[in-house]
Amino acid sequence: HQPRRQRQMCIRDRRNAVEINNAFAINYMEITDIKKQSSKYQITAINKLNGNKFTFFANNIIAATGVHALPGDYSVKSSGIKFSGGAHLILKDDPLKINGNGILLPKTEDNRIMFVLPWFGNTIVGTTDTETFSGTLDRPRANNEDKEYIIRHIKKYFNVDNVEYTSSWSGIRALIDNKLTSTKNVSRGHFFNNVDERFIQISGGKLTGFRLIAKESLELLFSDNFELT
């Protein structure tokens, strides 16, 4: 389960776009094809709730598809990304006695960091960083290896013999594929790929930087010299 506050922030930001800036937001609508038609883009989409299909046109496209490739003819133009799985555990109440404080575990066995955070009366511990993951891109899940990794570090740093968790979840990071290093060393920064005229794709980045990414996307898309190298 994704933390509630992240969901609330995403919903609030979308509502602000609709109510304040007259945006039009659609959930559960999958874009299945994009084709260039003269100076516009023809977009085919399907409503995932009822199966209805739609066709509409756009002058400009900003694609922030995360781990998913662009559809149709543009799939081969998607920037290379590397998947990284990140699992978390939720512990009931405050078994580690952090007393409402966030704690950073400075060094894991694979030279990363982990965190322990209070969350709605419970405790979150995470996260892993692995190039393999269980489940699907749409529904990833924490596997036994992920859980054992987190529990092993809890026992080490908090000197406890038993760790019980109430739930777990996993997410997939879409990182820039540099072909050279493991996911733990890949930058969490974002960059823009010039897919076509007035069509850019965002790769990498983190949720915490979404406002900056949106600002830079619009500045780039509507600049007089729209070119990326």
Regions found by a protein language model. Give the residues of each.
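Short, well-ordered coil/turn residues at beta-beta hairpins
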Residues: 62-65
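A conserved short coil-to-beta-strand element within the FAD-binding core of flavoproteins
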Residues: 27-41
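Core beta-strand elements of the Rossmann-like FAD/NAD(P) dinucleotide-binding domain
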Residues: 49-60
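Short, surface-exposed charged micro-motifs
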Residues: 24, 33, 57, 113-115, ...
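C-terminal catalytic lobe of FAD-dependent flavoproteins
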Residues: 12, 17, 69, 73, ...
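Short, hydrophobic/aromatic-rich segments at coil-to-beta transitions
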Residues: 39-43, 99-100
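Single conserved hydrophobic/aromatic residue that forms the stacking wall/gate
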Residues: 1-11
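Short, conserved active-site loop motifs that form the nucleotide-linked donor/cofactor pocket
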Residues: 7, 23-24, 199
